[in-house]
Curated annotation (Swiss-Prot):
Region annotated MPT adenylyltransferase, chain positions: 260-718
Protein name, as recorded: Gephyrin
Organism per entry: Dictyostelium discoideum
Subcellular location: Cell membrane; Cytoplasm, Cytosol; Cytoplasm, Cytoskeleton
Cofactor: Mg(2+)
Keywords: ATP-binding, Cell membrane, Cytoplasm, Cytoskeleton, Lipoprotein, Magnesium, Membrane, Metal-binding, Molybdenum, Molybdenum cofactor biosynthesis, Multifunctional enzyme, Nucleotide-binding, Transferase
Amino acid sequence: MSNTLTTERNITNSPTAAQLNEKESGKKEEEWIVGVLTTSDRVSQGIAIDQSGPEIVAIIKNQLKQMMGESCSINVITVYKVVPDEIEHIQQMITQWTHLKYKLILTTGGTGFTPRDVTPEAIKPLLNRRTKGIEIAMLKTSLDITPHAMLSRPIAGIRDQTLIITLPGSVKAIRENLGVVLPAIPHAIGLINSKPKSSLPESHRSKDYIKNSQIDSNLIINQNNQNNNNNNNNNNNNNNNNNSHNHHHHHHHSCGGSGKRGSSYNMTPVDEAIKIILEQCDNINNELEKVEITKSLGRILGEDISSVEPFPNFRASIKDGYAIRSKDGIGKYRLLGDSVAGNTGENLIPPQPQQPTNSINDDDNEKYCVRITTGAKIPDGYDSVVMIEETEMIGENMVSIEVTCKPGQDIREIGSDIASGTIVLNKGDKIGCAEIGLLATLGIQWVHCPKLPSISIISTGDELTDYQSKSDSMKSGIIRDSNSPTLATILQEISNHFGECCSRDNINLVGIIPDKLENLKDTLLDCSKKSDIIITSGGVSMGHLDLVKPLLEKIGTVHFGRVNMKPGKPLTFSTITTTTTDNNNQEEEKKKKTTLVFSLPGNPVSTVVTFYLFVVPALRKLGGFGIKNNGSQLNLPCVEVKLLDRIQLDHERPEYHRCTIEWDFQEHCFVSKSTGSQASCRLLSLKQANALLVLPQKHGHLEKGSMVKAILIGPINN
């Protein structure tokens, strides 16, 4: 999907200009066209799935007509489009929609502080009148929930006969903002179009307007999964540095669950979850370490590398032949000796000045040459090399040169490949075999690379036993722990296939921790002091013994507790901050250490899939990937593939379907074959899988032959 084109999603039938301009006095129903515009570079390029735009469409369809009452004769039609974060594209769409007399335009995204957040700058010049009351209402509602709302820049106003409101990009914030403004929108549209009574619900015309509005607002906020609170825990001992638009918890969690049977965490979109994780990576103290070049394969350079000497550092022959003086031209040459690779070529200087002789040609001054091999040093006094194919031996130590030569012909001059002081490798470059050869050529033995993160791996659950346990020693109801060895080997496999992002020496296999609060707490706190990253598996669902999530709310900061994906919905991401004191200087300020905690679901497939999607980008960022390309290399590579199977879609969540892909030389494209049943407990679905199909959240099927994106998790064997 091009980032210069507008993308339309046919959620509803789009009206034509003729329909909008048609006189409808004879019709029973009046049409209100509502435009929903998502501004996002990533969505417009097809590298992210939009959650916000469809959420607005769903709210409008489910709530707006309901607020206007059953007796209302207005037919609400929604049009949904996506444009990149470009002022020109945003303004073009807004202008088009207002010209078509859309009643309401709602934008989502681009209202923050980053350089690409330009929605307010695009909308503001188009407005005839600002509606600051709507802006204030949205800000007040959000500020009552989180102080991070002050980082939002909403704009609302009127252009011609259209009400325009900018909403944040977060699904959660959209529900909050629409919850407060939606009850007033029908009346506002009526006033703009000089029909105040026809669009105002009867209940809202009374003195109970505020009360009824609040009821509608709550209805919107809780319409999906009864979203009670946000992704973040309000922990007084930890600061949440995430600038996303989120709530904090204001109620107590009892470890092990409570009587409440719904999750208190919203479903975070995958892209938003990855963004939160990468932001928290900035809090890790990532130093440079000195690495011997033969051990640096796959690492990322943490500094520019410059040559300390020219290469070559002597004049070298490019070919086998004879070194001559170009001015001597065609003729007979006396062979003075040989210059071979590794030889200094000394004592082979032609005599000066040359004197006439009678040895071969009495008419010419005698000419001299040196036989030379490829890579050998050009002796002083010579400035050209003649290929051996263009010469002839005509006597003992006599050579006939049959062609003329130019100065410098077939000679590598000093520094012609690499001049002294030249930057040969840049900070952020990945070190491969060729880079190691280049470093060795220049005599560079050590390089500085970002220090690889230290990792602790923990499996949780009373039902687990060590994977080495014998069957006859296992009690009924006990299973072997497969997650710890799987994760430990995936860490090594990822480094082998996609670049070094962790070291085997830095992996701490903690083992199995039972479902006991104190055991788990002590282990997490101990690992947080030693490791940059903690990876746990299990204990994040809704069972009364799922202790990991409520415990992390107490000892750390939970940034999100559920992700909108299949498999892996319970994935939780947290940080634990500890302090250390320098024993040599008690007056020195205490140092803070942040540890990233990835709490993966316990089902083996969910564990592996969430590892690839969320842990790997963090590992790659801490390992230096993305330094050179502003983070574009952090996710695993993605390719487009043709399906060889008919695949069932999930209408509730996007799905990551395990498959094997290979290159089809006849079709000239990648093709994918499903690994079969995709149950999250079926580890066989990962057998031979080298990719994850990115399937949309949708009813129905994707037919055989459809083109979809696939995330590579292993090498393509053909």
